[in-house]
Amino acid sequence: MPAFYGGKLTTFEDDEKESEYGYVRKVSGPVVVADGMAGAAMYELVRVGHDNLIGEIIRLEGDSATIQVYEETAGLTVNDPVLRTHKPLSVELGPGILGNIFDGIQRPLKTIARISGDVYIPRGVSVPALDKDCLWEFQPNKFVEGDTITGGDLYATVFENTLMNHLVALPPDAMGKITYIAPAGQYSLKDTVIELEFQGIKKSYTMLQSWPVRTPRPVASKLAADTPLLTGQRVLDALFPSVLGGTCAIPGAFGCGKTVISQALSKYSNSDAVVYVGCGERGNEMAEVLMDFPQLTMTLPDGREESVMKRTTLVANTSNMPVAAREASIYTGITIAEYFRDMGYNVSMMADSTSRWAEALREISGRLAEMPADSGYPAYLAARLASFYERAGKVKCLGGPERNGSVTIVGAVSPPGGDFSDPVTSATLSIVQVFWGLDKKLAQRKHFPSVNWLISYSKYSTALESFYEKFDPDFINIRTKAREVLQREDDLNEIVQLVGKDALAEGDKITLETAKLLREDYLAQNAFTPYDKFCPFYKSVWMMRNIIHFYNLANQAVERAAGMDGQKITYTLIKHRLGDLFYRLVSQKFEDPAEGEDTLVEKFKKLYDDLNAGFRALEDETR
């Protein structure tokens, strides 16, 4: 019999034929072996036991199937029924996804909490992922009856919220001649909005479509990415940029700030939509996201303030939820991201953390008695990671009108003890193009974001050169000089520890002081202040320009004075005479972007000119 919760929550109806059933032979944690499953397919969705627990077939041998169950298996016994559904694990895609929170297999947590009245998810619960009764404002495009339409064509617009319009596309595998298209009005997800005829067969479609999570959604072609992912974090935007459609990894030990960087990207990046997957991380981190995001606002180009939650979907699969569902949560998240990409949007997907996903793979692999590889992880770990990260990219979308979309994947990795030679980290680094390596020592010094500028890298710098040339022709040279200064500081630190600062040449003292400026007042950023939580790219460029300009002018002044008979210019003299300008360099980060771009650029230009005037006056004095 179906189970009832509060008189409303019912599980799968069990009036199917007996031939659709197998029976449980063995239970080992989340892994169940069932017999009598002849004809079943790999990755087919099944319902296990009298509670109808959701499971997925991961191995077939003869008529026995090995199933990973996405819910707690306590209470399952031998000979319990296993019902086949004849479909793979799929997600529902349609209006209502944004602003929602799902678990790893796309069950809506708010709805379950409201209906069951419990803080925990009842076992075997079956609730539609999207509300089928909610009415949506449907506005058809230029298609009329008699037109030919193919998979991926956008045939209507649905008003999802004040931030985003939901563009309704025909499922990728559909095509035909339109025999009916719904007029403008309000419709639910159960209502037919378009009917097609192909080779004499009529098919009707609603605004809802279903897609198997392990199958990438088809695209017309892949494109080279050339637009930066602006995160609002200076160290990432200026030194190690990613692109819209890129792949990034954030490895770091516990307490280094991976989650804060992931959340900052969700809040402030220039993406149109964000899918945040909490995969096996602490439950209170997801709770923090749920409390913070609805209160956070973003300012649109027309000056409107909108809630960040309106462009965000959360997939919560915390560490106390069943292990097997962690694997599903990553695929659920990327499929939702691909759905919005197909509308022509730029989507970011945060996976926090892929290490927990790999640990779930390791546990299931151990239960299946597979041969372990490095650190007990399965031999196919790298292949699974690659197949996930390869679903990122900038694409030309299927169907018309012609449009481009992108999925950017940012995966946090938690290597034990911060050891980057860990199998998950090394497999991830062989795939991703951007590496934002977090450093425990920087985090202990309270330098956040604790991205180590000596080990991090980005392979997208060349792809973004044309963008930088248009934005600011000087930026590439300034950035190269800043990197040289930071690298030179690292080389000089050993000498300083041996002989002290005073024994250094004047040029080296200037290098050390400039590197300190870059480290403490440029790369470090306070995520909890209104002026520094988000740094627009123009502010990042101007701050770096002024610091490097100070470095160049100071070096030139010292070199010129060295070849003359007058008073020698030393670093101590520069700092003493130009202390006010030095203080203004340090204070650049306190300029609030809320004042507007023109006001801030004016202030930065004035500082640039004042630096020129200050050094000119100093050289005149010492002649």
UniProtKB/Swiss-Prot annotation:
The gene is VHA-A. It is a peripheral membrane protein. GO terms for cellular component: chloroplast; chloroplast envelope; cytosol; Golgi apparatus; mitochondrion; plant-type cell wall; plant-type vacuole; plasma membrane. Keywords: ATP-binding, Hydrogen ion transport, Ion transport, Membrane, Nucleotide-binding, Translocase, Transport, Vacuole. Catalytic subunit of the peripheral V1 complex of vacuolar ATPase. V-ATPase vacuolar ATPase is responsible for acidifying a variety of intracellular compartments in eukaryotic cells. It catalyses: ATP + H2O + 4 H(+)(in) = ADP + phosphate + 5 H(+)(out). InterPro entries: ATP-synt_VA_C, ATP-synth_a_Xtn, ATP_synth_asu-like_sf, ATPase_a/bsu_AS, ATPase_F1/V1/A1_a/bsu_N, ATPase_F1/V1/A1_a/bsu_N_sf, ATPase_F1/V1/A1_a/bsu_nucl-bd, ATPase_F1/V1_b/a_C. PROSITE patterns: ATPASE_ALPHA_BETA (PS00152). The keyword Ion transport applies. Belongs to the ATPase alpha/beta chains family. V-ATPase is a heteromultimeric enzyme composed of a peripheral catalytic V1 complex (components A to H) attached to an integral membrane V0 proton pore complex (components: a, c, c'', d and e). Binds to the deubiquitinating enzyme AMSH3. This is V-type proton ATPase catalytic subunit A. GO terms for biological process: ATP metabolic process; Golgi organization; pollen development. It comes from the Eukaryota. GO terms for molecular function: ATP binding; ATP hydrolysis activity; protease binding; proton-transporting ATPase activity, rotational mechanism. It comes from Arabidopsis thaliana.
